[in-house]
Amino acid sequence: MTPSASPSPSPNPGDANVKVDADSPNDFILFSHELPSGDIQDLIRRLHRYGTLPGYPHLARFLQECALLLRTEIQKLPRALRDSVPPFHDVVTLASHWDRLKSGPLSGAWDGPFLCLYEIAMLIGHHETHQLSYRRPACLVGISVGLFSAAAVAVSKSISDLVSYGAESVRTAFAFCVHVQRVSQELEPTMTEQAASVSWATVVIGVPADTIQVELDRFNHLKESESPGANARPLTGVSISHVDQTSVGVTGPPSRLKQLFRQSELLRSSRHSALPISGGLCHVPNVYDDEDVRAILEMAEVWEKWGTRALQVPLISPFTGSPFLCPDAYHLIEAICTEALTKQLYFDKLAGGVVTQLNGLSCQVLHYGASLMSDTIIDDVTSQLSPCDTARQCLVDWALRDAFDQLPGGPTPPRDAKLAVVGMACRMPGGADTPDHFWELLMNGVDTHTTVPPDRFDLDAHFDPSGEKENTTTKGSQSNRPLSRQAEQTDPMQRLALVTAYEALEMAGFVPNRTPSSHLSRVGTYYGQASDDYREVNAGQKIGTYGIPGTERGFGNGRINYFFNFQGPSFNIDTACSSGLAAVQAACSALWAGEADTVVAGGLNVITSPDIYCMLSKGHFLSKTGQCKVWDIGADGYCRADGIGSVVIKRLDDALADNDVILACISAGATNHSAESISITQPHAAAQRENYRQVMDRAGVSPLDVSFVELHGTGTQVGDAVESESVLSFFAPLGRRSHPDKRLHLGAVKSNIGHGEAAAGIASLIKVLLMYRNNTIPRHIGIRTAMNPVVAQHLANRNAGILSENHPWLAATASKKRYAIVNSFGAHGGNTTLLLEDAPSQHSQRYKNHSRRVVASSEVVCTSAKSKASLRANIRALLAYLDTHQETDLRDLAYTTSARRMHHHIRIASSVTSTAQLRSFLQAAADDVDAYAKHIATATKRTAVFAFSGQGCLYHGAAAHLFEQAPLFRNQVLQLDRIVRRLGFPSILVTVAGDAASVYDSARCPHRESTPSSDASHDSNTNRTSTAPAVDSPLIAQLALVVIQIALVQYWGLLGIKPSVVIGHSLGEYAALVAASVLSVADALFLVGKRAELMLAVCEPGSHAMLSVRGASVDRIEELCRESEKRYPFEVSCVNGLTDLVVTGLRGDMASLRDLLQGSGLKCVLLDIPFAFHSKQMSPILEDFENAAQQITFQEPAVPVISPLLGKCISEANVINGKYLARATREPVDFVAALDSAWADGTVNDKSIWIDIGPHPVCTSFASNHYGKAATQSFASLRRGDETLSTLTATLAALHCLGLPVDWNEYYDLRENPARLLHLDSYQWNYKNYWIPYEGSWTLDKAHAGQNNKTKDDNSAVTPAFFTSSVQQIIFEEYDESMGRMEALSDLHHPDLQGAADGHKIHGRSVVTGSIWADITLTVGEYLYKQMVPGGKMPHMNVKGMEVLEAQVLHPDMSQFIQIEGVLDLPRQQTAVRLYAASANGTRNTDKPFASATVCYEEAQDWQDQWQMTSHLVAARANSFWEMAAGGSDDNARPAGKGGPRVNNFFRSIAYQLFANVVDYGARYRGMQRVALSEDTLEATADIVLDKDRHGTWHTPPHWIDSAFQLAGFVMNSFGVQGDGKISGSSRDFFYITPGWRHFRLLERLEPGPEATYRSFVRMFPVGSEPGAYSGDIYLHRGKRLVGVCAGIKFKAVPRALMPVLFPRIEPQAGKRRNQAQTAENRLVKGKGNCEYTHTVFQEPKSRTPAYDVTKSQPHAEHCDISISQKTQPVAAVPVTQPALPAKERGEQNQGQSQSQNAQATACLSLISDETGLDLDDLTGEAAFADLGVDSLMSLALSAKIRAELGIDVQSSIFLECPTVQDLVTWLSK
């Protein structure tokens, strides 16, 4: 609401200038503009601590209101900005993240609100500390943002007013700062830098303001002749922001400030320093206007919150030096925003303004501590008031005292917020697997009790009616049914807790991090559990891997938190029979205390143990006759029952804000104890009444207003009597409920389903929630014969009773709510009570009374699952819902299935316009799930390519429908239009939005009252309608296209889709550069507008034309022209495809050429464009355009830019500049070359997703035509003629199914067009049976078990554990305080280690490469350090002094073992590692090591400091090699230039063919993709991609190390260096081997695959002291970063004649290894699972990628498709379609697939299926093991089984190395 839309306050200038008389206070308050120096977090902590003390109630309330308002304002921000703010519930928590806030995308928005919070809080605390009455000062002074604090004081009459308006000033300051930062970032993005350190202002000392202004005018080019048609003062200009006696402040974009002080000799030589202003531009006349002020006022709701409040105290303007002349608070805030945005600060004027408001002989200055600016102003006031005495009072001193010696005034009372129950789920007896089924059971009066099922235990064996048999029960009834099964080692209670939690969250529409209350760090779990039957009886018989996490109580909650990634509290609570409701009450307390924002709570009970029956029977708890007979005369105890229930609860305000469906509200809750009962198990009426009183008093509700009480109602004589007394005496006292409408109804669900013990309370709560939903009270079936006379006596004359028939429960009205009580009492004496009430009436009516905008639009409906079976069932459930709810609104359904669902990795989605169309789609999908389902693989990453079309796709109103229907997009367009107009160009709104623009164009400049605060001289050139060109002018058209494209980029970003790569065609490249952060928004629009103006000024419209030609190449066109024997002068402007061209020339020539080509059967179109772009017509504007672009700042691309001008991908800075844009204007657009380059270098591939950014898809069609439709997946944003936005919704549906993270919550703007959350059917689980049955009757005689068992004496040795592939067995360890020592034994013929050696052959023999010794050294170094410093930060390791004295050559006919010794000297921070030849028993063959090295533990920063000087030099030298090698071939050297070295360029195959002259590398070692080598200088550089497979368990796989650093060996051995140091063409005389290196350092772990490309460089030098020896340093870069160095690597010459001697060839002979070797291998491989020690295995971190289909069960448990050990996280996408392959490649692929399906693979998959319970159908293709539930524990178990049963040597990391089924099958086939 704004003043123009509401009754405007009457201006009364006479009241605005508040006068003070002689008796008024003679003091003033100075509000600073900057936060105090020092620790802001400590200041806020101090304020928070004072706020907890009893003497500071106003301070406490102020801090609470600030937190609430900031949370509200943050929710208004786009998702990306919201997510950058950590969750907080109070300001101290928010302030604790200060460093994170100041480095995030809102870095500049926090100083302002925290300044206001600080200033107001200090002022309030000052009054409360000194117990001062609130006294208004004579006047106020504020500077910049400090004016908002001053405004709060200016309108406050009391300290209470100051609390309210102070909090509003914080809100307004936040809105102001957010707006300033957003606008400033559009002028120059600084978020890519360390934002907090970027300064937008500089102070210059000692130079007059007039002199500085002259310099600024010169710098800003303020000569109209230099900027024809453009704004005289560019948005990015530098201007003066403040002036005082000694200094002048200048402000502007950071890069422009740097240029200013570089170019201006005057300013460069002056005294100047940067100001700590990181938020953006303020006090500038050239950037903001009234629209900005209005936007801030609307965002902060200033009219609604400040309104017509009168000013109480004059506030001095720092611009005029006089009081603001404003009639009310609204206009005061408006004036402050205007001044803070657009007016300069004149501090010299402030003193005079203050003096005019003061009188008397003394005055007091209240200030916020010393600062240069404050001291200057106060000194000026003091000097002008002389001889008046001026006293100073610091408002901060009170908070800086360290003495918090005041005692708190008791505990802080619970917050009075009501809570909302928004979700529920259950598994109850009688088949009640859903709340709806549970309700049917209650309405039908079903008694569910039955005998104990045989799968629990043998009832005949454990039942003894006499009660005399030991460990038997006399009661055998149980009220349950076999529920669902799952993984047998996990307690069914834990499985069902997870299942029902999921279903309750699904009903609640919970999506992680969707809103503040759903932030994962603010969600907790609370469950009640009172027994461990399954652990004690069932799982204890078959203890396995999951024994502990599957059965210990804490894991029940922990598994839910882990699965969903909840980071809030997790409590498992046992209060006997009341555990479930006590857990709910504890969860409510957490919400009231602010410990969580959302809680999942419930109760768990699954009965499997006969022992508990026995105990309860012996204790006389159980009924001998069946079901609980609550209040029946024959009540004799209770019937035990299974039960699981979960509810989701939030604070009511959060639920309303989150658009949740509220089932009911919880007003209050309490738990107490019956301490005065005569027996611990006997209830106590007085304690129960006290419990009720606590609840009702806390809620402030009369007991007489309660209309229903759900009793605990166990059905015992004592319990029924006591509870009836306590309930009726409190809620229905005699004579008090006389009115018929006040009747109290009673009920007890135990009469239907029995006593669920720990689940009893949650069952009662769910029953009452269902009553609220269905407006009915179910009948009570507990009285089977007659009522208990004691109960009847209590009921008499109280207008209370029990219903024997279902009874309507009238829904709440505006004047009357329904209140209900839920009781639950524990046998241990605990009493828990909750008070429930109706959801707010305005909530239930909000949609009925809201008239939606009637817009025909498409909607996206989607569903997903963890398995195809569940997906099919989910689809059918959705169809069934549509059948039974034919009135369903399509938007509600779309909103529910997209924005309010957690999405799984098997998905379907469709864009539809009607429910009939949806029904058709769903039916087809249900009939053929395989055809419709899209599988999202966690292991595949997708690239999103944004393609920006050129001007030819624009048409009038191109984005009209999206503008009208999508507020997010509309807001972007309106903001961009404002920038266009501020740049001096005409509005583009009509061109973009068509007729819809008129509504918003008129709203942009509404009639506003003129007030004294308005400055008539404020320049504004935003309204140029009188001189604006026609809508279809080239200027408007070009600006409009770029505005649409930029707005689409921003819109897609808000929806969660951001580009990985961008490509722009012609004009579209400007928007592409904005998307890549090369250009700011303002700069891009300036350049586009400037270019268009130059065209209009210089070029003649219509003189030239552009002709689109399809179906012919350039050669064909030229051929046709020659054949015609006529001259058709043309030039090629665009190469869109091999036969899709645009040619240009004079219009007449193009018309003739068109006729010629059409006559030859070609399709030609003359484009309706006034200019011929990319032709010689553009030449006259190039120089002026390039000059205009020189003032623009070009940033380094944030994502690769595919350049159609250069035909390559650009990732580095300084390539795109003004010259580039000038060339792009004139030179042709070669889209084909750009596409080819992007594919060749891997920037795009067949998995890339192409999104066309423009009014109509053009560029994506170019890509599809060029690559082939099978190799591209392209989608459009808009399409001409699409009025329902079906193009956009279809794209959203497709992107969702491809796994891109669509933010559906942002897509739905509920403020403008609300949607309702529907309660659809819950997830359809794919149940499978898993259950460990209780065998026999061993519990009957367990006390005597084992008396006859003989004790076994097992002295067999335990085989040491397998450690890694290179350090296989640790056979000895010892440690003391400073030293650690270990010995390990490894078999060189172990498959992993032998495989590594086999990849490095010399003369046909496998030789252990030095990279294996490096891995061993790193492994030992890390292991010892972690053992000696457990939990400490692992430093980086430098492998120094590697010396290999003897090569290890593998012999196939003998065993070969090595012993590894490591000795850690902790004080010296180093580990000595020595390697010895050894026997199979670990004995060394010799005391002389064959290799040794030292690991030194060092700091990475020291390395980086050392490398800083050389890194860029090395990189530059390597780059120059590639430039010199350009144009060469594999076998032809190219001269590098005059006097330069000859450089040869080799690709992978040739390089390793040359290498094979000495070393024959296996495939895994062939990481060098290409090499550039100079024989002259022994230099080389190589581009490297590491093999994706680790091939074992390693610290750093040897084939990775070798690939990264083998370049030196290539230099020495590829051509050969002779013994005299000369180089020859081959290695015929010598070959070179390396004995080691000086040091080896890796800054980071190596990463495999094309995503991590490395570049190495080396230069080898002769070692003067060693003839035939060479040494060099190998440098390894990843991108621009130096990540590794192997320094001093040495190679020694060996005569080639010795090669057959050193490495004699041996023909392979099978089966020659001796028995000793076989025994040792068995010991090392087969004995891995039987380990005595536990060691950390060095391998990649275990993936925690989710699989939603968590295994969930109900008792007797079914297994559904949720993996219990996984958590939910986003997943990456896989391609929907695979690219077509040539026939030969298809044949090879099919052959490979055929070979992979061998018996070994089949057996392995069958074993995995057996062990996991997965169907073989699930183990196909791209199915990811992580998604299927294979976690770290399961990986260990499966790998052990595969080794033991199939004899396949696999490590537990196999499922990380082969993340999908296809990966594993491929690996097995190898």
Swiss-Prot record:
Which cofactor names does the annotation list? pantetheine 4'-phosphate
Sequence segments annotated as region (Disordered): 453-492, 1004-1027
Q: What is an annotated GO biological process for this record, any one?
A: fatty acid biosynthetic process
Q: Which GO terms describe its molecular function?
A: 3-oxoacyl-[acyl-carrier-protein] synthase activity; fatty acid synthase activity; phosphopantetheine binding
User: What is written in the cofactor note of this entry?
Assistant: Binds 1 phosphopantetheine covalently.
Q: Which residues carry this modification: O-(pantetheine 4'-phosphoryl)serine?
A: 1832
Question: Catalytic site residues?
Answer: 577 (for beta-ketoacyl synthase activity), 712 (for beta-ketoacyl synthase activity), 755 (for beta-ketoacyl synthase activity), 1400 (proton acceptor), 1602 (proton donor)
Region feature (C-terminal hotdog fold): 1538-1700
From the UniProt entry, list the residue stretches annotated as the region Product template (PT) domain.
1364-1704
Carrier domain mapped to chain residues: 1795-1870
Region annotation (Malonyl-CoA:ACP transacylase (MAT) domain) ranges: 947-1282
Q: What class of enzyme is it?
A: transferase
What range(s) does the PKS/mFAS DH domain occupy? 1368-1700
Pathway(s) it belongs to:
Secondary metabolite biosynthesis
Region (N-terminal hotdog fold) residue spans: 1368-1502
Composition bias of kind Polar residues appears in 473-492, 1011-1027
- Chain's role: Non-reducing polyketide synthase; part of the pkg gene cluster that mediates the biosynthesis of dihydrocitreoisocoumarin and 6,8-dihydroxy-3-(2-oxopropyl)-isocoumarin. The non-reducing polyketide synthase pkgA performs the condensation of one acetyl-CoA starter unit with 6 and 5 malonyl-CoA units, respectively. As pkgA lacks a releasing domain, the thioesterase pkgB is necessary to break the thioester bond and release dihydrocitreoisocoumarin and 6,8-dihydroxy-3-(2-oxopropyl)-isocoumarin from pkgA.
Matching entries from PANTHER family are given as: FATTY ACID SYNTHASE, NON-REDUCING POLYKETIDE SYNTHASE APTA-RELATED
What is written about domains in the entry's comments?
Multidomain protein; including a starter unit:ACP transacylase (SAT) that selects the starter unit; a ketosynthase (KS) that catalyzes repeated decarboxylative condensation to elongate the polyketide backbone; a malonyl-CoA:ACP transacylase (MAT) that selects and transfers the extender unit malonyl-CoA; a product template (PT) domain that controls the immediate cyclization regioselectivity of the reactive polyketide backbone; and an acyl-carrier protein (ACP) that serves as the tether of the growing and completed polyketide via its phosphopantetheinyl arm.
Q: What is this protein called?
A: Non-reducing polyketide synthase pkgA
Taxonomy of origin reads: Eukaryota, Fungi, Dikarya, Ascomycota, Pezizomycotina
Q: Which gene encodes it?
A: pkgA
